[in-house]
Amino acid sequence: MIIGIGSDLIDIRRIENSLERHGQRFVQRIYTEVEQARSENRRARAASYAKRFAAKEACAKALGTGLAQGVFWRDMGVVNLPSGAPTMALTGGALARLEKILPPGHKAAIHLTITDDFPLAQAFVIIEALPVEQAPH
């Protein structure tokens, strides 16, 4: 069953401006080490960071909190499954919120799609509650 859905659309130029104005302070405040490693050496660095920013916003919406109630930027990070598909890794307040909204006997599957077409980046997140016997391992 779907227990959360969120989407976000961001102007990549907004992230470009933040990167230029605030540099590493911005990057370290918002992005996990894994996200930084994936984005830093990309030719389209700002687009890579913008997609991850949109994913965090979409995930926070899917959790039902937005970036509030103890859910912080670095509590949510875009990671890739062995197949290469993106998903979200949650820690801290985001993980606590996920555990709170999961029905007993269920595990979460977080589905994420991210895309960009300059000047926009977009993300959709669906949080699915699967019975433990069906949950991916």
UniProtKB/Swiss-Prot annotation:
Primary location recorded for the protein, binned into one broad class: cytoplasm
Protein's GO biological process: fatty acid biosynthetic process
Positions in coiled-coil regions: none
Keywords: Cytoplasm, Fatty acid biosynthesis, Fatty acid metabolism, Lipid biosynthesis, Lipid metabolism, Magnesium, Metal-binding, Transferase
Documented EC number(s): 2.7.8.7
Gene3D superfamilies (alphabetical): 4'-phosphopantetheinyl transferase domain (3.90.470.20)
Annotated S-S bridges: none
Gene Ontology CC annotations of this record: cytoplasm
UniProt-listed InterPro entries: 4-PPantetheinyl_Trfase_dom, 4-PPantetheinyl_Trfase_dom_sf, ACPS, Ppantetheine-prot_Trfase_dom
Enzyme class, broadest EC rank: transferase
Pfam families named in the record: ACPS
Known cofactor(s): Mg(2+)
Annotated compartments: Cytoplasm
Domain of life: Bacteria
Catalysed reactions, as listed in the record: apo-[ACP] + CoA = holo-[ACP] + adenosine 3',5'-bisphosphate + H(+)
An example molecular function term from Gene Ontology annotations: magnesium ion binding
Function (record text): Transfers the 4'-phosphopantetheine moiety from coenzyme A to a Ser of acyl-carrier-protein.
Protein name: Holo-[acyl-carrier-protein] synthase
Naturally occurring in which organism (per UniProt): Mesorhizobium japonicum (strain LMG 29417 / CECT 9101 / MAFF 303099)
Originating gene: acpS
